[in-house]
A protein has these predicted regions:
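Conserved ankyrin/ankyrin-like repeat signature
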Residues: 48-49, 81-82, 114-115, 147-148
Length: 155
């Protein structure tokens, strides 16, 4: 009788463990769907969705699988209003992606001058370098944006 009870307890515990594991897996899948929605909204400039996420406490500097933040994505896609919304909500403009590039560097590559102006005001460290060893000044020179950077520095 003791063995049957013990075996029943073990089987119940295993069943509960598998159930919790499946539940955890489902939660992770749902969370990843929300992350994708947040980044899609930043990518296309859907500020209503971005604002909803931010107002509900979603981590504004969360990184996607490519190591980008929503601010980086919005800047690269030219979504000025979304960039402004994210900055006003506390997004960190100085974060770097897996290549060491910042949102400002992305805006310079895409020649998004008005976005670059907003991002430049974040005053990231001038010593910040990407993985290629380029600081902002050298990066701007390589991408033909040194005049743009000078104009940002003079404002």
């Amino acid at each position: 009788m003791k063995n049957v009870f013990l075996l029943s307890s073990v089987l119940f515990s295993l069943g509960l463990s598998f159930s919790l594991f499946a539940s955890q897996d489902k939660l992770e899948t749902q969370y990843q769907s929300l992350v994708e929605l947040f980044f899609d909204a930043a990518r296309i400039g859907n500020n209503e969705v971005v604002e909803t996420f931010v107002s509900q406490g979603f981590p504004i500097d969360h990184r996607n699988n490519e190591s980008y933040t929503a601010l980086m994505v919005a800047a690269y896609q030219g979504n000025k209003d979304t960039v402004r919304l994210l900055l006003d909500s506390g997004a960190n403009a100085c974060l770097q992606d897996k290549r060491g590039n910042t949102a400002l560097m992305g805006a310079l590559i895409k020649r998004e001058i008005s976005i670059a102006k907003d991002l430049y005001q974040a005053e990231c460290s001038p010593d910040l370098r990407n993985r290629a060893g380029l600081d902002l000044k050298t990066f701007a020179e390589i991408y033909g944006q040194s005049e743009v950077l000078k104009s940002l520095q003079n404002k």
